[in-house]
Curated annotation (Swiss-Prot):
Protein name from the UniProt record: Major pollen allergen Ole e 1
Effect of residue 51 to A: 50% loss of IgG binding
Cross-referenced PANTHER family: OLEE1-LIKE PROTEIN (PTHR31614:SF24), PROTEIN DOWNSTREAM OF FLC-RELATED (PTHR31614)
Result of changing residue 24 to S: In strain: cv. Rowghani; variant 3. In Ole e 1.0105
Variant or mutagenesis effect after changing residue 95 to I: In strain: cv. Rowghani; variant 3 and cv. Zard; variant 2. In Ole e 1.0105
Amino acid sequence: EDIPQPPVSQFHIQGQVYCDTCRAGFITELSEFIPGASLRLQCKDKENGDVTFTEVGYTRAEGLYSMLVERDHKNEFCEITLISSGRKDCNEIPTEGWAKPSLKFKLNTVNGTTRTVNPLGFFKKEALPKCAQVYNKLGMYPPNM
């Protein structure tokens, strides 16, 4: 018999922010994690779109962040958005292709006290020269070819 679980009163959303040194739109072996980046977590009611929760967080060492979310936000749509990078040489917020400036998700599958989300990345101004080798290993063409 299924026993209904009590609503979660608080939990953590955690993830990482990285510098996309190859401007690939995903983590590569040359990516570097960014301490000191800021992000915003915002949840909205799925019925009327009203904002129900907003929190700003900052990355620590290894680009890790963890934000405490108060109360249950089941059946709401939430989004984590990049605000600013901790690195001047890697602060371009991606807007097209595979890379996105934000990550959208629903909080209806929270089990326990932590929810880990996919990493978000800032683009380096220009790709590192070694990136051609990375793309070659992956069997891909570098962007802008």
